[in-house]
Amino acid sequence: MTLPKVTAVEQVSALVTVLGALEVEHDLEPGVLRFEIQVETPQSILAADGTALVARLIHASAGRCTALHYGTYDYSASCGIVGRYQSMEHPAADHAKAVMQVAAAGTGVELSDGSTNVLPVGDRDRVHAGWRLHARLVQRSLERGFSQGWDLHPGQLPTRFLATYAFYRDGLDVTVRRLAAYAGVGEPTEYLDEPATAAALADTVVRGLECGAIAESELGEIDRETLVRLRR
């Protein structure tokens, strides 16, 4: 489930209380009911006291929050951005998502980017323009550490898949060589990778495997067990 338009920690705390009561009422395992938070108000990013409220929202969820979603258009409108400039790549959007990213780091909470309302519909030129825009925005999100994003139209699914597959395949050979060298099963490379970078490289490969962009046969001396170990 998704909790939208959050403006106060108390709203998250209230949902936690309700879910706990539902688990007791229906004899469910404690903590099994979880939720995602839609970050679509300025108040969910910056509290009146100047603190990053989104970080407090995560901790107020008592481990029930699984993801943060950026809400492109509600957030932009609340910041006073006129319609023609409301976008996933507006500076206000990037600021909000950067705060979300730092707040979620190390918590296990996933991140999801927002959507574009420019749809691939109409004549051939408009469809192709919509696809080009969407593919570029998906690539941009992935480059910035947002592995998921919202789509508003079935016509955006082809570019979602294509951009995601291309992202995880791009540079795969170099990534595999670096991981093999770090794990001690391959030749040394020109990179001096530290544990945190190796974990990020392994995470990228695992995500590529899980979405179908990469086959295990392409990993050479690196196996899933090694990836899991390095990813931690």
Locate each region found by the language model:
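Expand to "…catalyze enediolate/carbanion chemistry for C-C bond making/breaking, isomerization
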Residues: 2-232
